[in-house]
Amino acid sequence: MAKKVVGFIKLQIPAGGANPAPPVGPALGQKGVNIMEFCKQFNAKTQSQAGTIIPVVITVFSDKSFTFITKTPPAAVLLIKEAGLQKGSGEPNKNKVGTVSKEQVRKIAELKMPDLNAVDVEGAMQMVMGTARSMGIVVED
């Protein structure tokens, strides 16, 4: 018989940096998941991407076991890395803080394609360009 799903937990954790401290510990503790076991598995799976924030969806079952799926890093994190910035603009409509090229946007869109709800790369690029616009990053042709 299949295990019964008790719930899903969505977190954004730095790759290779999961530890029992908040936010990971309390979120997993509420569902009764073995926190250290998750931390070991997550860190082992993401150690090659160290420093990047990785979204993860943890599926918790009735017997307290779990599985997890890692997603691609958020578009905002990838844009900041491509533009060489510390953070986005506080007033994106007034202050532009950086620029990225269409090629850089295409690269990010292709990387994000599995997680985006887009039919083709052009649609994914539009989503990434919208994120850039909301962060005060100018997209150049």
UniProtKB/Swiss-Prot annotation:
Post-translationally, this protein is described as follows, namely: One or more lysine residues are methylated.
Q: Which UniProt keywords apply?
A: Methylation, Ribonucleoprotein, Ribosomal protein, RNA-binding, rRNA-binding
Known CDD domains for this protein?
Ribosomal_L11
**Which Gene3D superfamilies does this chain map to?**
Ribosomal protein L11, C-terminal domain, Ribosomal protein L11/L12, N-terminal domain
Query: Taxonomically, which superkingdom?
Result: Bacteria
Identify the NCBIfam families for this entry.
L11_bact
The family this protein is said to belong to? Belongs to the universal ribosomal protein uL11 family.
Question: Which PANTHER family does this one have?
Answer: 60S RIBOSOMAL PROTEIN L12, LARGE RIBOSOMAL SUBUNIT PROTEIN UL11M
Tell me what this protein is called.
Answer: Large ribosomal subunit protein uL11
The organism's lineage?
Answer: Bacteria, Pseudomonadati, Chlorobiota, Chlorobiia, Chlorobiales
